[in-house]
């Protein structure tokens, strides 16, 4: 809506300054439309720069249980991890999402086509004294403060814009956490 107002006010400002013949009416109309145009541009710039009209919202979601990445012949439950980068605490985690799933799958693999979004997402793990493993996702995003701001500033799907997303997989102390290299060694040693 604000972009449409800017386009319309640009045309009105042009017409006010160049097409109105009366000097007094031209100054008043031209100044008013120019001030309205400047305020619309300022509002759009403030929204793009400092998210004017928006507020951060945090949602925490504890989702499904997870199941061991190891074969059923191994007595311990396994979580296989692979660190992304050398110093980051960001991981690709390999586990099963259902007990009947035949092969474990990697989760939290960054999307190389959406790098701006991928850099805002992190996944890690921790071992704690819990009974069941779980996945907890904390998501922070920009949302409009009211319907007025949403109507005024919505363009390019900027509502629910991601600030950060942190996912933590919590496993019991009885689980073994292995790197991908360690998991390969265990797989070679395990009888089929």
Where do the model's predicted regions map?
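Membrane-interfacial entry segments at the cytosolic side of transmembrane helices
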Residues: 26-34
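Alpha-helical transmembrane signal-anchor/signal-peptide segments
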Residues: 48-73
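Generic structural signal for short, flexible, solvent-exposed coil/loop and linker residues
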Residues: 55-56, 73, 82, 158-160, ...
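Short extracytoplasmic
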Residues: 67-91
């Amino acid at each position: 809506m604000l972009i449409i107002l800017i386009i319309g006010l640009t045309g009105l400002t042009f017409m006010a300054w160049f097409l109105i013949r009366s000097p007094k009416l031209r100054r008043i109309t031209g100044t008013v439309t120019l001030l309205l145009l400047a305020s619309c541009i300022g509002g759009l710039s403030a929204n793009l720069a400092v998210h004017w009209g928006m507020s951060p919202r945090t949602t925490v979601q504890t989702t499904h249980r997870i199941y061991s990445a190891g074969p059923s012949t191994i007595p311990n439950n396994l979580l296989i991890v692979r660190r992304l980068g050398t110093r980051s605490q960001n991981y690709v985690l390999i586990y099963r999402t259902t007990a009947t799933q035949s092969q474990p799958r990697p989760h939290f693999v960054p999307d190389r086509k959406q790098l701006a979004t991928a850099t805002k997402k992190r996944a890690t793990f921790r071992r704690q004294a819990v009974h069941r493993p779980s996945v907890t996702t904390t998501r922070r995003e920009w949302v409009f403060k009211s319907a007025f701001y949403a109507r005024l500033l919505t363009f390019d799907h900027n509502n629910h814009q991601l600030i950060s997303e942190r996912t933590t997989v919590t496993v019991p102390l009885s689980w073994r956490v292995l790197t991908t290299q360690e998991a390969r060694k265990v797989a070679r040693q395990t009888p089929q």
